[in-house]
Amino acid sequence: MPIIKVRDNEPFDVALRRFKRSCEKAGILADVRAREFYEKPTTARKRAKAAAVKRLAKKLSRENARRVRLY
């Protein structure tokens, strides 16, 4: 769990914002949402594979767009 130290004369809002940012960087909220409901292993594998395919398609489309702009 992220820990922040509140500095002297630091407003509460600023400290809360720093804490939220550190939680987001640590990926706590995403992890909690992922574990909110049980996901069968087959469903998890299927979701991970779909994400990998999507990443690959995005990468290829970026490379193709770069090639088109070079000409």
From Swiss-Prot:
The keyword Ribonucleoprotein applies. The keyword Ribosomal protein applies. Keywords: Ribonucleoprotein, Ribosomal protein. One of its GO terms (molecular function) is structural constituent of ribosome. Gene3D superfamilies: Ribosomal protein S8 (1.20.5.1150). GO terms for cellular component: ribonucleoprotein complex; ribosome. PANTHER family: MITOCHONDRIAL 28S RIBOSOMAL PROTEIN S21 (PTHR21109), SMALL RIBOSOMAL SUBUNIT PROTEIN BS21 (PTHR21109:SF22). Belongs to the bacterial ribosomal protein bS21 family. This is Small ribosomal subunit protein bS21. It comes from Shewanella woodyi (strain ATCC 51908 / MS32).
